[in-house]
Amino acid sequence: MLIDNKIISVLTIKDYKKSLDLAKCLYDSGIINLDIRLRTQQSKKAIELIKNSKFKFNIGIGTVLSLEDLYFVKSLGIKYAYSPNTDVKILNNANKLDIQFIPGISNIDNVISAVKYNCKYLKYYPAEKSGGVSNLDLIIAKSKIKNLKFIAMGGITSINIKPYLMHKNIIGIGTSWIAEESLIESSNWKEIRKRASVLLES
């Protein structure tokens, strides 16, 4: 599902005009996997620009909370999407639309709901606030389901990423630390490149 490495840059873009400069910065830094959130009015325009750019990213769309969001994902030909929860209506429709949906889980009940809808991957979110890898181990043990695969997101930075990188059930780590909103808004591409390098070398 992920390309080249486990790092996913989670992006909240408020000004779509910065999209291509941001894309170039990340791509040149070795960041290929993106989770672009549908959190702002200009998110969709930003996603379209990056998707249709010369940069060959592996794009997932985050904060998918409605059927309208799902149809947007489908319209762009994007194969997977994230949500912060396990909304049954969204899970059911994602299956019908052949979208690889990655719902947010933080406890065993969430896992059971997601597995019923054939979710291959689960988003462990918010990872740090939920108790980090220790809590994830408890969830895995309680589930009694073999080969659960997770993408961890929420509060992960260069300081605490190591346990997530080493965990055998975690196939990807999403972080907004690489390109925080303030860095994007101020066009601080130098700092974004620096942070990308730090995580890719972790």
Which functions belong to the PLM regions below?
Residues Y80, P84-I90, K123-V133, N169-N188:
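Glycine-rich phosphate-binding active-site loops on the catalytic face of alpha/beta enzymes
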Residues N118-K123, S134-L136, A141, K146-L148:
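A contiguous pocket-lining binding segment that forms or flanks enzyme active sites
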Residues K6-L11, L34-I36, I59-G62, A81-Y82, ...:
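Hydrophobic faces of well-ordered beta-strands that scaffold small-molecule active sites
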Residues I50, A94, I139-K142:
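Hydrophobic positions in alpha-helices of CheY-like receiver
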Residues L91-N92, K96-S130:
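Histidine/lysine/aspartate-rich catalytic loop segments that bind and position anionic ligands
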Residues M1-K79, T86, K96, S158, ...:
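Conserved N-terminal beta1-alpha1 strand-loop-helix module at the mouth
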Residues I139, N147, S158-Y164, N169, ...:
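C-terminal output/effector regions of signal-responsive regulators
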Residues Y71, I90-A94, V111-K116, G132-D137, ...:
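Short, charged, surface-exposed secondary-structure boundary motifs
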